[in-house]
Amino acid sequence: MVSLTKRCIAEFIGTFFLVFFGAGAAAITLMIASGGTAPNPFNIGIGLLGGLGDWVAIGLAFGFAIAASIYALGNISGCHINPAVTIGLWSVKKFPGRDVVPYIIAQLLGAAFASFIFLQCAGITAATIGGLGATAPFPGIGYWQAMLAETVGTFLLMITIMGIAVDERAPKGFAGIIIGLTVAGIITTIGNITGSSLNPARTFGPYLNDMVFAGTNLWNYFPIYVIGPVVGAVLAALTYQYLTSE
């Protein structure tokens, strides 16, 4: 049995991986689209397919980060890298209650540190223009619409996790790529509604660093990205448990 300390370190690293590459890709896309980076030949493809093309690219960045994290760290901590997933697994007794808070703390710290390091790499415009990839409802999207989108998106993610990673009958070795592609698809679908967080930690890291370094306060939206994902994950876990019970 891997110690709790080692598992929490793995969760920290995995969530760092997710936010640095995923939210970082979102920030860079915004920076390039708004002229926040110097023109160069490598920028030419950005926006070539319009907004949808950018969401596909961002979704794939998240998807590859998740897949890599699962394959690298899954055997250590289970690679939740998401407080909603941790709570969802706990709700169906697939994760011990005593480890829930340490896991969530590790995930939040990993996300915050990832945003901080990305800011140091990309410069202050990553926060002032790119928002460090922070999520927020898009214009015309109401608070409850956004929460519903996050709930549905996380439900789909969690039902996939239950089927491909938690269920012992699932084929081995496919969890990383299937979960990663699922996240990429969900981001492409609801990205232009909520920014598609599906993960309280993924939103927490950019919010904290945006507030500290850019003076941007988005915390009024934070409940969307906590309540929506947690409700979606718990409902999915309970639904899967019901569907597979004898």
From Swiss-Prot:
Q: Which residues lie on this side of the membrane: Extracellular?
A: 33-45, 91-103, 167-172, 239-246
Coiled coil region boundaries: none
Query: What SUPFAM superfamilies does this protein's entry cite?
Result: Aquaporin-like (SSF81338)
The regions listed as transmembrane in this protein's record are 12-32, 46-66, 70-90, 104-124, 146-166, 173-193, 218-238
Q: What is its main location?
A: membrane
Give the record's keywords alphabetically. Answer: Cell membrane, Membrane, Repeat, Transmembrane, Transmembrane helix, Transport
Q: Which InterPro entries match?
A: Aquaporin-like (IPR023271), Aquaporin_transptr (IPR034294), MIP (IPR000425), MIP_CS (IPR022357)
Query: How would you describe this protein's topology in the membrane?
Result: Multi-pass membrane protein
Question: What would you give as a GO molecular function for this chain, any one?
Answer: water channel activity
| Comment field on protein domains | Aquaporins contain two tandem repeats each containing three membrane-spanning domains and a pore-forming loop with the signature motif Asn-Pro-Ala (NPA).
Q: Could you tell me what this protein does?
A: Channel that permits osmotically driven movement of water in both directions. It mediates rapid entry or exit of water in response to abrupt changes in osmolarity. Also exhibits a transient but reproducible increase in the initial glycerol flux.
Per UniProt, subunit arrangement is: Homotetramer.
Which named protein is this? Answer: Aquaporin AqpM
Instruction: Provide the organism lineage as a comma list.
Output: Archaea, Methanobacteriati, Methanobacteriota, Methanomada group, Methanobacteria
Gene name linked to the record? aqpM
